[in-house]
Amino acid sequence: MYNRQLILEDGTVYKGYAFGADVENVGEVVFNTSMTGYQEILSDPSYNGQIVTLTYPLIGNYGINRDDFESMKPCIKGMVVKEVCATPSNFRSEKTLDEALKDFGIPGIYGIDTRALTRKLRSKGVVKGCLVSIDRNVDEVVAELKKTVLPTNQIEQVSSKSISPALGRGRRVVLVDLGMKIGIVRELVSRGCDVIVVPYNTTAEEVLRLEPDGVMLTNGPGDPEDAKESIEMIKGIINKVTIFGICMGHQLVSLACGAKTYKLKFGHRGGNHPVKNILTGRVDITSQNHGYAVDIDSLNDTDLELTHIAINDRSCEGVRHKKYPVFTVQFHPEAAAGPHDTSYLFDEFIKNIDNNMK
């Protein structure tokens, strides 16, 4: 018998079975089309405040291990799947997905038609939703959802609270934590970088005081226009140091240079998004997770030029500065999870640092 339901703000109800924590949560309902990588999705801070629908029909079949987390504490509001595996099989598996969600206090629902839900989100756009007990009155929950205002301080919720010690030797890279994935740190350290992680609200003066050879701006959740402190910091360093922005970092650099952003109807979330480098003609398959994009037309009045576009919807996927060693991409070159087609961009960042140090 059904014991949990997903109720959307428009009154649509999906009845299913509970797994994970026995709690009720409200969030923005989104979908991800990746076939694997549910542990990385679960722990990606960019999903802060969201209820994530996984379109692949069977989730959890290789369990949860200690190595594949992208943050210390997952912050999604819920997980929606067609079928959840209760008996995972993998030599690294330490617990089931159900057990992991219970440990982190995250509710889940399975047994619903995730294809129907995804088609609805694709055609109507993402909406607020709530995972609740089957006993809850639908009209009451819908009324609560309509009154609910989703938080605007999402980057603050997931960013580091203080400056971290260095994690390596070599080129000094200040990593501005907007909701970073551990995979980004891993890529930098593997290239011999001395990585210093700083909070999102670190000032330009504080960043420059660390004497960085380069600055990287990470991924993160929410509306980029809410991150005003980060935008001001970027304005203060953009002509003084080599910069590489990823995802949220890409959007903030664009805003700092005078471009505009807008909310996508249903976002880009998955591990199979084709992106074209319009400078070289190269097409890469990328991992993506974002609900906002940079307005291409707004680049005309800035010192930025378009470098990458999405094949599927022709939206902006990358820019570079015309005067300074600054470039950004909307997708995730560190993958985790996803294809590694664009990991070479970390090498481009290192090359820019070296050229700027000469």
Swiss-Prot record:
Q: Where are the transmembrane segments?
A: none
Which parts of the sequence are annotated with region: CPSase?
Answer: 1-168, 1-171
Q: Which UniProt keywords apply?
A: Amino-acid biosynthesis, Arginine biosynthesis, ATP-binding, Glutamine amidotransferase, Ligase, Nucleotide-binding, Pyrimidine biosynthesis
One GO molecular-function annotation for this sequence? Answer: glutaminase activity
* Glutamine amidotransferase type-1 domain ranges (all copies): 172-358
Q: Where does L-glutamine bind?
A: S46, G220, G222, M248, Q251, N289, G291, Y292
Q: In which pathway does it act?
A: Amino-acid biosynthesis; L-arginine biosynthesis; carbamoyl phosphate from bicarbonate: step 1/1; Pyrimidine metabolism; UMP biosynthesis via de novo pathway; (S)-dihydroorotate from bicarbonate: step 1/3
The UniProt entry, under InterPro entries, shows:
Anth_synth/Amidotransfase, CarbamoylP_synth_ssu, CarbamoylP_synth_ssu_N, CarbP_synth_ssu_N_sf, Class_I_gatase-like, CPSase_GATase1, GATASE
Q: Name one GO biological process term.
A: 'de novo' UMP biosynthetic process
Q: Which reaction does it catalyse?
A: hydrogencarbonate + L-glutamine + 2 ATP + H2O = carbamoyl phosphate + L-glutamate + 2 ADP + phosphate + 2 H(+)
Top-level taxon in the UniProt lineage = Bacteria
The UniProt entry, under Pfam families, shows: CPSase_sm_chain (PF00988), GATase (PF00117)
PANTHER family per UniProt? CARBAMOYL-PHOSPHATE SYNTHASE SMALL CHAIN, MULTIFUNCTIONAL TRYPTOPHAN BIOSYNTHESIS PROTEIN-RELATED
Subunit structure, as described in the record: Composed of two chains; the small (or glutamine) chain promotes the hydrolysis of glutamine to ammonia, which is used by the large (or ammonia) chain to synthesize carbamoyl phosphate. Tetramer of heterodimers (alpha,beta)4.
What function does this protein fulfil? Small subunit of the glutamine-dependent carbamoyl phosphate synthetase (CPSase). CPSase catalyzes the formation of carbamoyl phosphate from the ammonia moiety of glutamine, carbonate, and phosphate donated by ATP, constituting the first step of 2 biosynthetic pathways, one leading to arginine and/or urea and the other to pyrimidine nucleotides. The small subunit (glutamine amidotransferase) binds and cleaves glutamine to supply the large subunit with the substrate ammonia.
Q: Which NCBIfam families match?
A: CPSaseIIsmall (TIGR01368), PRK12838.1 (NF009475)
Q: What is this protein called?
A: Carbamoyl phosphate synthase small chain
The organism of origin for this protein: Fusobacterium nucleatum subsp. nucleatum (strain ATCC 25586 / DSM 15643 / BCRC 10681 / CIP 101130 / JCM 8532 / KCTC 2640 / LMG 13131 / VPI 4355)
The gene name reads carA
